[in-house]
């Protein structure tokens, strides 16, 4: 295919939350295809400023050459839980990887809980995914990314490659955390894979002032009880806590992320997480 022929979609969704009238409001939204959102749900009467929003895909996943973005802005004092309706499939990409960039800004005393379901890498899938988080003083956030692989034909065919990037900085531009990871599908599935026998991977950052953070042992134990192998440690520059999860499959990984995120949610909000149907 000639290089000058564009393939894939170019779209960026924008969600802006503000505090007003004793609650949080989705005051700014731009949700082009293939994105779709539900109306905000209010699941915590004791904390009316905390709302829940489901982000959905109308297209069946990420495809060759896609360039999709998600911008989330939390205004001062606002609080939101943004999640997905289901896992997102990344389809065969050939020589044009799909790209997904998430940019998050959390203002002073705001809270964001953004724990999407795993990205499922099909055979031949190539993906580059980045997450950039900007924090103002007093901001709190729980943000995750996760991948699993699946061959619908059951032949064990690997994905092509995946690249993950994370950046966390202050509103003044000071870098707190920066990391990148890359692995080819053949390495991921190899007998000497750096993941050992595990076939799903997740990462979560729990960000906020030190007195608000959960007990690391409690978070790790909650994830381990689901069948995951979890490890948690402080992030550089006192940014918060960083969790890594390994799991045998995407379902176990999702359960581990939910368990760990629930402990983080409770510590940062003082509330037990409400059941969210999917």
UniProtKB/Swiss-Prot annotation:
Subcellular localization: Cytoplasm
A GO molecular-function descriptor: nickel cation binding
Pfam families: UreD
Coiled coil: none
Keyword presence, Cytoplasm: yes
GO CC entries: cytoplasm
Alphabetically ordered keywords of this record: Chaperone, Cytoplasm, Nickel insertion, Plasmid
Location (main, coarse): cytoplasm
Similarity comment text for this entry: Belongs to the UreD family.
Cited function: Required for maturation of urease via the functional incorporation of the urease nickel metallocenter.
Assembly with partners or alone: UreD, UreF and UreG form a complex that acts as a GTP-hydrolysis-dependent molecular chaperone, activating the urease apoprotein by helping to assemble the nickel containing metallocenter of UreC. The UreE protein probably delivers the nickel.
Name listed for the protein in its UniProt record: Urease accessory protein UreD 2
Gene that this sequence comes from: ureD2
